[in-house]
């Protein structure tokens, strides 16, 4: 019975171990468990005196049971880490990695991938996440180590208790004492090995954490060094500026310097307080600093970081801080009232020299300077080194666009309320050149300052274009306009006659335009007339505007020549004969009469010949026996009744006229062939 109970217990334990084996374990663990179960069953059935379970199989089964309990423990730890996630989100990645490592139960190896992850956590990544991890892990490194070591010890103690309970269940009191002693020895040895392995693992993890904490502390120390260097350089520059200020200033400037020193002392105290504060208060202290301290230019940071061994880390950290503090600075600048601008709006206030050159769009640029040009030149001779000037100018010039627009709007309001003529400071030429090179916008100046700044030659050139609005300026401007207008008029006088008396157009234009619109167009007839001087007809036809240079429209012009009315009086019947012929066909107009106006008889013969040709071409149109209406026929009969019959003499005359007509026609054809 006892043997059967033992076999049943072993089978149940083996089945439970097989069923509860995690899915993530490989085939090797499953094979070991099945082999152990088969060996136990075969030994129990074959040999009664032999030990039922070998120590190797006992270790395998114990490991499988521990894995089941490890899963439950991992779930509990996951729930704990989820609660911790809500409180401390920076430990999420570390907690999840530890829980997954404990669930699998795999040994921790110092792989290069884990080292890369640690390096990326501490050196890579964005500004916010890296700073948060640095802050929170530098705050709580000891707590994490203590909690993890306590968990490891607690799990070891629980494992030892569970082993004892299993042994008590499997072997009742008073039975198999020898086997139990041997098993206890084996378990103690395995427990020692397990403890040694767990101790090694905990030591390796502790070493890694210590290395990462040391790395973070070194990085933090470097950042603090750079911040302290920058602040000390700023304070030293301000002190040297204060010491080098001339003591020739009035009492009002001295009182303003004292107030400024008090403010700078307060700023130095706040900077010392921020140095003493721990790392996790660094973000708040940064937001309380003035805007020009929070926003240093990238060029200055690169100069500081070039001498460091880890310049890339410092630059990325500064960029991340800038991104993080950008919104906080903007809100702080909006919420806090600008007392300096309110003071500057009063007439008795005069800005100190330290605030004279600020960023673009600020009111300090427009504040009146109490000193004269001689004092400025003296001060410039004793001026501090160029590096300090460039650093201060760069620091003040790198303001954000939001603050620029905000202060610019305020500045426009102050300037709109009241503006005095001497409100703009007179800048030294060297200082303004330096400011322009550094990227500042030019300050609005009076004409006197611009005259001093530019050499005489440049001012004479500018005087032609930009004159003052006084009497001399008006006279000079009118003289200048007259000088500018005179060469244009002379140019027009030179070019207009060329355009007026241009050479006569080509034969193609004359054929296309002159002969097309006027059959009596002859260039030789009026070559010396006034018509040629007024402009060519074909040029005016080609103009799209319909106007020439004098503003005369096409309709007002006379495009046709002055006709010789004496010559037309000698042709009494030409209009009656040829009254509609030129209107009907311009392209086929005869050129004989155009060329032979000197010969009256030939012109008359030519008209008669054309009349006869058209009569032959259109007999119905010229025939008297055409079809007529009844009324016209009655009138025609009356005319015939009135007409008398021709005599023989009249018939002979008509025949002679016809013969003469034929001869004249031949003569006219000969002339036309010659021409």
Swiss-Prot record:
Post-translational modification as stated in the protein's UniProt record: Extensively processed in glucagonoma tissue by limited proteolysis at conserved basic residues. Alternative processing are seen in different tissues. The proglucagon-converting enzymes present in transformed alpha-cells are likely candidates to be involved in tissue-specific processing.
One cellular component term from this protein's GO annotations in UniProt: secretory granule
Glycan attachment residues as annotated in the record: 93, 236
Modification Arginine amide, positions: 674
Principal location: secreted
UniProt signal peptide: 1-20
Localisation: Secreted
Ranges where the record places region Disordered: 64-507, 528-555, 620-646
Domain of life: Eukaryota
Record PTM Sulfotyrosine, positions in chain: 339, 469, 563, 622
Compositional bias (Basic and acidic residues): 64-90, 148-161, 168-248, 292-311, 361-410, 429-452, 637-646
Positions bearing Phosphoserine: 93, 99-100, 129, 147, 190, 255, 259, 291, 309, 333, 362, 372, 375, 397, 490, 529, 540, 624
Pfam families associated with the record: Granin
Assembly behavior: Interacts with ITPR1 in the secretory granules.
Similarity-based family: Belongs to the chromogranin/secretogranin protein family.
Function in brief: Secretogranin-1 is a neuroendocrine secretory granule protein, which may be the precursor for other biologically active peptides.
Record-given protein name: Secretogranin-1
Organism whose genome encodes this protein: Rattus norvegicus (Rat)
């Amino acid at each position: 019975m006892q043997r059967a109970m033992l076999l049943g217990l072993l089978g149940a334990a083996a089945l439970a171990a097989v069923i509860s084996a995690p899915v993530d374990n490989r085939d090797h663990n499953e094979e070991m468990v099945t082999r152990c179960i088969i060996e136990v069953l075969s030994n129990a059935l074959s040999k009664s005196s032999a030990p039922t379970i070998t120590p190797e199989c006992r270790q395998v089964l114990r490991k499988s049971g521990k894995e089941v309990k490890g899963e439950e423990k991992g779930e509990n730890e996951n729930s704990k880490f989820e609660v911790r996630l809500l409180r401390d989100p920076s430990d999420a990645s570390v907690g999840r990695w530890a829980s997954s490592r404990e669930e699998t139960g795999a040994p921790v190896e110092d792989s290069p991938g884990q080292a890369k992850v640690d390096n990326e956590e501490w050196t890579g990544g964005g500004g916010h996440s890296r700073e948060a991890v640095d802050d929170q892990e530098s705050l709580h490194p000891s707590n994490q180590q203590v909690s993890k070591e306590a968990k490891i010890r607690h799990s070891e103690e629980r494992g030892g208790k569970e082993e004892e309970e299993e042994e008590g269940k499997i072997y009742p009191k008073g039975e198999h004492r020898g086997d139990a002693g041997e098993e206890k020895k084996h378990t103690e040895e395995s427990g020692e090995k397990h403890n040694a392995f767990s101790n090694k693992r905990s030591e390796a993890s502790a070493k890694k954490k210590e290395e990462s904490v040391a790395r973070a502390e070194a990085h933090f120390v470097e950042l603090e060094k750079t911040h302290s260097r920058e602040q000390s350089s700023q304070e030293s520059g301000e002190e040297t500026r204060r010491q080098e200020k001339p003591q020739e200033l009035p009492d009002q400037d001295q009182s303003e310097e004292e107030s400024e020193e008090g403010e700078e002392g307060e700023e130095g105290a706040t900077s010392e307080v921020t140095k003493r504060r721990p790392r996790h208060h660094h973000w708040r202290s940064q937001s309380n600093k003035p805007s020009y301290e929070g926003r240093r230019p990238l060029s200055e940071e690169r100069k500081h970081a070039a001498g460091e061994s880890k310049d890339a880390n410092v630059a990325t950290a500064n960029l991340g801080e800038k991104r993080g503090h950008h919104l906080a600075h903007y809100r702080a600048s909006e919420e806090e009232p600008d007392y300096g601008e309110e003071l500057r709006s009063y007439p008795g206030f005069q800005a100190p020299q330290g605030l004279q050159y600020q960023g673009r769009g600020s009111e300090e640029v427009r504040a009146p300077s109490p000193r004269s040009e001689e004092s400025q030149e003296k001060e410039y001779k004793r001026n501090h080194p160029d590096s300090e000037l460039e650093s201060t100018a760069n620091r003040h010039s790198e303001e954000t666009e939001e603050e620029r627009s905000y202060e610019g709007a305020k500045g426009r309001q102050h300037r709109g309320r009241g503006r005095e003529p001497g409100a703009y400071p007179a800048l030294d030429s060297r200082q303004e050149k330096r400011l322009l090179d550094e990227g500042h916008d030019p300050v609005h100046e009076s004409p006197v300052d611009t005259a001093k700044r530019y050499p005489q030659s440049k001012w004479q050139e500018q005087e032609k274009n930009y004159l003052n609005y006084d009497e001399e300026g008006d006279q000079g401007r009118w003289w200048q306009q007259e000088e500018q207008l005179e060469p244009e008029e002379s140019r027009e006088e030179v070019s207009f006659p060329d355009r007026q008396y241009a050479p006569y157009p080509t034969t193609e234009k004359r054929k296309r335009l002159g002969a097309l619109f006027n059959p009596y167009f002859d260039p030789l007839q009026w070559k010396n007339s006034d018509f040629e001087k007024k402009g060519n007809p074909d040029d005016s036809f080609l103009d799209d505007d319909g106007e020439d240079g004098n503003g005369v429209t096409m309709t007002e012009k006379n495009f046709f020549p002055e006709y010789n009315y004496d010559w037309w009086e000698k042709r009494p019947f030409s209009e009656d004969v040829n009254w509609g012929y030129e209107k009907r066909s311009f392209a086929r107009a005869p050129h004989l009469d155009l060329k032979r106006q000197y010969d009256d008889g030939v012109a008359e013969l030519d008209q008669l010949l054309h009349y006869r040709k058209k009569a032959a071409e259109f007999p119905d149109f010229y025939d008297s026996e055409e079809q007529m209406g009844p009324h016209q026929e009655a009138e025609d009969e009356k005319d015939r009744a009135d007409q008398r019959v021709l005599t023989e003499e009249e018939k002979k005359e008509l025949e002679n006229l016809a013969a003469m007509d034929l001869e004249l026609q031949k003569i006219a054809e000969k002339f036309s062939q010659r021409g």
